[in-house]
């Protein structure tokens, strides 16, 4: 079967840069889906995207759809005709389903059967519908119309190229008649560009100053930016999302170095970086110490004969932005950070929970409660908590919301606050996402935990639980943040106490009954997903969860111990024994016996197990007290042999009630040893 390369390019006005990659991938996926549905084979697929175009290249696409056969079985003959040979409703219904007369149905076999051979269509006749369907299915939240046309798309369309081999596909899509003429760079080559063949698409456009391959543009920008940064004795800050956005803004990228006045470096560099990245799409430069250099890199969409004009233009544009940041910084410093706190009395945190000022006071008290329990200073944590939200009322944060916490840090230092108190104002928001940085100070950790617990308790306390994908107060992220800080920073905080303190701080604003348990359940449930991501079996998590440890660090240490235990050869058998013992003890009416008396032993294996349990108990008590859980379980693994011998030789449910109770007590002691670490019966 013959095959040809297929190219489709839709030309438009400038597409939304942040959506360009998504649109391109969806365009390719839609075309691929259409080709597969039509049974059309091909060799490879490529997608290209630039500010004014979306294109897909399919290599070695079959030029003819294969023939196909339809074979449908109907009702049995005896059900299809009555005794007189007249067709029943079953037969007539089958014919109607097939879209033919009953006479066209094969009646020779045990069942009615309809067979049809469908001849394949030329690929060229199928492509317009495939392309149009793909464009209609693009994830475009809001489509627009232009001129007096009825067609809708994300931006007005300007041209359409559709080639199968050397032939133009005759069609009109989104008000554009297909041809072989594309367009070059808006300034360098504004005239049309003839695409000589699908395989020459990239080369033909490159000659017209258009790099249609986004990956090529991205690599060029990244490489050239790094080279220019090195020449400036610096390192460029190139966030992946900013690089993608800049790549989507230019067809012929030309990175250039610009500068700004050094006086602006007195402003917190985070504010300067934020405005240059978010508003101007610039790449900022840092020196070897991580300090901002008074230079930046812009990516022009033109190869100018006089690049100095472009450089000066960008320097002129950025100056008012930096001047604004400088003004806000100076204005805010005219008063102490603490003075902004009163303004927060008029800023609502949550209607039922009070103002942001109220929240800061609660955070202050809770942070002071937490700090000494994780090795910190209560007074400093209280101070940091009180100042934690002050910068929300500053002009800097009002203009640059991303500066919350960061602005507070600089203003606190300006006021002479201790370094760890100042740092805590920024670290309270950590971690800002999955895998993000954690607080570096104990004071910061205490405030971060307090802030998150206060939000969790407050929102749960008014019944606004997260549901499905809706989590407006980011409670899941808050819970995971608390867990990450405690586990990864190795802080042994009893969350039972901390959550109870947080509940009491709200007073009558929340429904306190059962609230602490609800919040704790939610927090520790987040560990399940965390461990699953780390490859920890859910049974391991559940074995520890059954004990309800209050410390996240302790919880994690137990999980790691159970993970190690499960690799031991004795693990499976001991888990099964614990399951058996658990089932036996659960059937006892009343309290489980606790007294073991050797006089009721009537089998040597009972003596052996009792002796082994006593020895193990003595050995593991100091281990468990020191939280050496792996060592504890490894030592208990030695009980497998006497346990197996006991169950082989001893009938637990003896007829004599005292003997039976004695054996229950022995098994309860055995199970209690393991429960010092986890309920390993869950592993069976």
Swiss-Prot record:
Any GO BP annotation: arginyl-tRNA aminoacylation
Catalytic reactions on record: tRNA(Gly) + glycine + ATP = glycyl-tRNA(Gly) + AMP + diphosphate
Short name of any one Pfam family annotated for the protein: tRNA_synt_2f
Subcellular location: Cytoplasm
E.C. number: 6.1.1.14
Coiled coil (residue ranges): none
Family matches, as PROSITE patterns: AA_TRNA_LIGASE_II_GLYAB
First-tier enzyme category under EC: ligase
Gene Ontology cellular component list: cytosol
Keyword annotations: Aminoacyl-tRNA synthetase, ATP-binding, Cytoplasm, Ligase, Nucleotide-binding, Protein biosynthesis
Predominant location: cytoplasm
GO molecular function: arginine-tRNA ligase activity; ATP binding; glycine-tRNA ligase activity
Similarity remark: Belongs to the class-II aminoacyl-tRNA synthetase family.
Subunit structure: Tetramer of two alpha and two beta subunits.
Protein name, entry field: Glycine--tRNA ligase beta subunit
Lineage, uppermost ranks: Bacteria, Pseudomonadati, Pseudomonadota, Gammaproteobacteria, Pseudomonadales
Chain's gene name: glyS
